Amino acid sequence: MAKLINDIKEKFNKQYANIDKRIVVCGGTGCIAGGSQQVYEAFQKEYKKRGLPYTVEITDGCREHSTYISKSGCQGFCAQGPLVSVGDIFYTKVKVTDVEEIVEKTVLKGEVIDRLLYVNPTDQKHCKTLKDIPFYQKQHRILLADCGKINPEDINEYIGHGGYQGLVKALEIGPEATIEEMKKSQLRGRGGAGFPTGMKWEFTRKSKGDEKYMICNGDEGDPGAFMDRSLLEGNPHSIVEGMIIAGFATGACKGYFYIRAEYPLAIERIQIAIDACYKTGLLGKNILGTGFNYDLEIRYGAGAFVCGEETALIASTEGLKGTPRPKPPFPAQSGLWGKPTVINNVETLASVPVIFREGPDAYRKVLVPGEFCGPTLR
């Protein structure tokens, strides 16, 4: 079953070897609001005008020594957007009118345009690369490691960076062993309650019922909360992979992404990821030849604050008014349409592929010690 994933990874890396340069335009919501989509399109027009080889998608047709012009998820430095990287050179507050100069000086001549570099207000030094910027220097990213780097709309690049290897491992060891790995990792719910994820999965798997469901809680109730939104937009496949692993472990037949309608870009990119998984054979019938059948679907939230609570979220997913229900019964016993249901937060699900790719012991190394241990910030 690993052959398909390994073949895609090998093919992508072979195609990517034809790329001479890469221009990454931040495609997070903040930068898009500042005009990054227009900047992205301007780079393509400038290359076309000059007759320079470029591509916006890594395929067999990529010409040697071409430039890959790609979008990324949020890079986390929204106040300085739109952000553009040309190789390691990191430009801030880029406008459409800057594109011609960037291509002429940076792409063709290798020169750095100082006025587009971030200036550290402490010492007034120009920061040439992202790593030179104090904001980034002490960050150790786990869930957000690929956000801002990979194209969130390209399943092949996600696989090229190790994506869906965690799913392969879970399918190989079986659902019970998958739950044991989760318990070893000591992952707790990242939505705030901190309930052990492996235990929640185990409860649902052992619950009686022919139909079981997974729900990803992508509804952030707090005004201005962008953590989950950044993950949904920037690395959607990490959450989709987590949902598939969770569905396999719990015996679910279907999973739902509950995402508020005010997050159109997150919805769009999750849908692109889901469609790509169906096309690749990672969703639907007989996934990777294992006999495991699983489907994913998006349900829109109306933006009600209370729908962040799991029983209200279940009601809303069913098409009812988002009203909390008394517990017990808990969702693991009687959830969506009265069937056993697991509800996990976006960050919880994005942690799952990391655990299976790196191993539960490696994941535990980033836990905060104490009685209520949990992963450090992303």
Language model feature labels by segment:
Residues 1-378:
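Feature of Fe-S/electron-transfer and energy-metabolism proteins
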